[in-house]
């Protein structure tokens, strides 16, 4: 610890790992995404909120609850269904374990793989494009970025 990188203060070091990032994405079909990542917070929790024209979904890994609220024509505004989910016991609240279980099931022929390599590569390219935007301060067109990195 005294001589290696693990003994260095994370605040007074050459550490250049991003600790806060906001990315805005616009998809071809008009869907927008606002992604915020912050390493330093009183509540170190992963949360998601999906907002649509007829409802929204909110979830938090800390409270193991998914809330679905519907609104609009024919729906009583403010009606929320609450689903309690079993907390994960391994990395990423059980997500790592779930990925491995699905992978093994696919290898055993117990289920069909519905996720293509192309989908996986594209999702990674989007993350790399967000990082490129963070580093350069420019808006990045993902299609153009993908062409440049895949060439």
Feature locations, PLM:
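C-terminal helical cap and adjacent loop that interface with cofactors, partners, or active-site loops
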Residues: 17-151
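Alpha-helix-centered segments that form part of catalytic cores
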Residues: 1-26
């Amino acid at each position: 610890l005294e001589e290696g990188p693990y003994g260095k203060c994370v605040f007074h070091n050459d550490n250049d790992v991003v600790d806060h990032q906001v990315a805005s994405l616009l998809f071809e079909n008009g869907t927008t995404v606002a992604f915020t990542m912050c390493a330093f917070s009183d509540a170190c929790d992963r949360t998601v909120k999906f907002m649509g024209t007829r409802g929204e979904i909110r979830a938090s890994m800390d409270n193991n609850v998914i809330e679905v609220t519907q609104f609009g024509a024919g729906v009583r505004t403010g009606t929320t269904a609450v689903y309690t989910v079993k907390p994960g016991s391994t990395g990423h609240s059980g997500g790592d374990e779930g990925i491995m279980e699905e992978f093994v099931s696919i290898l055993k022929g117990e289920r069909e793989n519905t996720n293509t390599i192309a989908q996986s590569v594209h999702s990674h390219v989007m993350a790399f494009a967000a990082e490129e935007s963070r580093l350069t301060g420019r808006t990045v067109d993902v299609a153009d970025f993908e062409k440049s990195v895949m060439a």
